[in-house]
Regions:
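Conserved ATP-binding TGD loop and adjacent catalytic N/P-domain core of P-type ATPases
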Residues: 1-128
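Membrane-embedded transport module
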Residues: 100, 105-187
Length: 187
């Protein structure tokens, strides 16, 4: 297959995210290396038969790598299933789309970097929100239960506890809304 027009920018965007890009292809080594050099791809694994792709993914995982596989065909389905994150191109086959963890709606390679950015940001926000909730509960519940009443005279009245719980929920929702900043700017 010929490289898509946005492929060099997509590889650069993945590099900016700290991702090592590997081309896993059935093409011959010389052709694959030529295309990889044009696109800035880090590693090439060429001459791989369709049934061997998932074994190559498993070998990368055995080396301690977290692997995201992008594919669109029937031949890619086992590798998409083997990968830590399977990413199907939306214009791909039904089996690839069914097997993947993420389905890109367009056939634009730049969307891979966008999906990874949104995924990483979502995990970061989940951890932050969990931290807010645990922190709030670790402080507010003992106070509301009157644990500090004998020693410090500190206790929350029920209506103040309910109000502060609402405030905690508002902080969590506002923090989650910051995910919108991760979307790429329209061009």
């Amino acid at each position: 297959d010929a490289a898509r027009e946005t492929a060099p920018a997509a590889v650069a965007a993945l590099h900016d995210l700290g991702v090592r890009v590997v081309m896993l292809t059935g093409d011959n080594q010389a052709t694959a290396e030529r295309i990889a050099a044009q696109l800035g791809i880090d590693d090439v694994i060429a001459g791989v038969l369709p049934e061997g792709k998932s074994a190559q993914i498993a070998a990368l995982q055995k080396d301690g790598r977290v692997v995201a596989m992008v594919g669109d065909g029937v031949n890619d389905a086992p590798a998409l299933a083997q990968a830590d994150v399977g990413i199907a191109i939306g214009a791909g086959t039904d089996v690839a789309i069914e097997t993947a963890d993420v389905v890109l709606m367009r056939s634009d390679p730049l969307d891979v970097a966008t999906a990874l950015t949104i995924g990483r940001g979502t995990l970061r926000k989940m951890r932050q929100n969990l931290g807010w909730a645990v922190g709030y509960n670790a402080i507010a519940l003992p106070i509301a239960a009157g644990v500090f009443m004998p020693a410090f005279g500190l206790m929350l009245r029920p209506e103040i506890a309910a109000l502060s719980m609402s405030g905690s929920s508002i902080i969590v929702v506002a923090n989650a809304l910051l995910l919108k900043r991760l979307l790429p700017k329209p061009q």
